[in-house]
Amino acid sequence: MSDKLKQFKLLIVLSLFLLAIPLYFTYNHFRQSSALKESFEKNERIEVLHRLTSSEKYASDIRKAGYTIPSDGAIRLDGVIYPLEIEGDLHLKISPPKEDAKDFQLFFITQVNEKQTHVAFILDKNLNLIDSSYSQQNDNGKREIVSVSQSEEDYLLKSVQSEIDAFMKKMYQTLYG
């Protein structure tokens, strides 16, 4: 009788253990998903970008929303989604921000003074410009740093801000309906 009781207790402990494993993973998935929604609602753009691009977890949702990202194999190989492409007026390429980052980088190509210009922006959490870089190809085929007018930079910044805001709204709609 004692043997059957021990077996029964062991069976209960084993069942509880096996039940706890999927519950843990379900809870962890829910916690991560709710943290992303909370970041969206608090308008923490860098945190949202980090969570969306830090793994392949949201890759299908990003594609479903109409944005261009690398293949799943490339994402697994790199460990992040790089680049996240927003194909608006400027065709932005966003680098994935690191965890707890205070800023993030993006790149695009545009026309300045009728010449193709490569642009790099570093933006803070409020999409304010921290730093910028502009380069054009010279007659020798080498890239050289150029400067642009303040009005041109302001115009480009406003365009970038509106495209990122539109991305945030569309991703929120895609994920949370």
Regions of interest found by a model, annotated:
Residues 9-25:
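Hydrophobic membrane-insertion alpha-helices, especially the h-region
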Residues 22-100:
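N-terminal export/targeting and maturation segments
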Residues 13, 31-34, 162:
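Basic, mixed-charge low-complexity alpha-helical segments
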Residues 82-177:
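Extracytoplasmic electrostatic interaction patches
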Residues 9, 31, 118-120:
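Compositionally biased, intrinsically disordered low-complexity segments enriched
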Residues 1-7:
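Short, Lys/Arg-rich N-terminal segment immediately upstream of the first membrane anchor
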